[in-house]
Amino acid sequence: VIGQNLAISLLSSALKKKHIAPGYIFQGPHGVGRSLTARRFLEGLVNNGMPTIRERNRIKRLNHPDLIWIEPTYINQGRLIPQSAAEKESIQKRTPPQIRLEQIRDIKTFLSKQPLETDMGMVVIEAVETMKEGASNALLKTLEEPGKGILILISSRPESLLPTIRSRCQEIPFS
């Protein structure tokens, strides 16, 4: 990722030292490579930093069994519709999409299970600042006891997160 030397340096150092925090906040404006960096960082956690082409592709396509990638959702006819799918299907809603309590509960369930192919469960939450209070409190509990897992929170407005969430994560600045 071009122009993100500090973020890349901090994450590379963590991988080299094998000192992985249970939570990270990738913070910075939209379009600067936070999601791409999250994928690359997760690749560094797989197979001792030597992921196979198959493993890389599964992370890229977000279909690795030890990875959950959460994005804000709409509720449409009782179903959660990810923001990206709603945009493709031209579903328009009156309320903005958000990270919902059900999604955070799914993370807790996911992290309580033994990873299938890696050393830890991997969770990425995009636009984490869209959470409401209930979801924020549930995420805080998950961060307090992540088990064998890593959470990467991607935010363009980290100041809107609960201070206790921020204090439990290593902040990675993007500019």
What are these regions (language model features)?
Residues 1-134:
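Clamp-loader machinery-focused feature within the broader ASCE/P-loop NTPase space
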Residues 112-113, 137-153:
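Conserved catalytic/switch belt of AAA+ P-loop NTPases
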Residues 163-175:
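A short helix-turn-beta junction within AAA+ P-loop NTPase domains corresponding to the substrate/partner-engaging
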Residues 127-131, 146, 158:
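Conserved Walker B
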Residues 109, 141, 167:
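Conserved adenine-binding aromatic site and its adjacent loop/helix in ATP-hydrolyzing domains
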